[in-house]
Amino acid sequence: MMKIFKRILPIVIIVVVVGLVYSFFHIDGREIKNIKKLSSDCKVSVVVSDTYGNENRQEYELNANQIEGLKNLLMNNSYKRRLSSTIIGQLPEKDYSILADWDNDGTSQVLLYIKVIGNEYINFSQQFNIFKHNIYHEIKNPDFEKELISILETE
């Protein structure tokens, strides 16, 4: 009996550790704080600008269908936590700042602020960060930026 226990215990410990490591690095879109509260009652704006400056800056105010599309895009994707706040390499040309305000009895409250850099990195303002560092997470969907642009361009 003890021999079986001695063989099974290390396997169980390894499986638990692997599960914990995976859950730490894997962020599901449904884990984003306040994402489920995003609705047509919110004022959602998206600012698209050049990564290296504010030339060609465009601002979009989203309608109800666009808000629902954005909510689905964010919730139905997954992201990979990074241990560094530094982005190394060539940055994409465009970045997107998503701001959702919720008006509660005349008092505006920021519900959600997300910064997206191209198709590669995303930051959920003060959420999923490590030791108070502002961390950009990797987007695991290779078509994320295309889908975001199609949401912004629909009327």
Positions of the model-derived regions?
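Function-determining sites in protein domains
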Residues: K3-P10, V17-E155
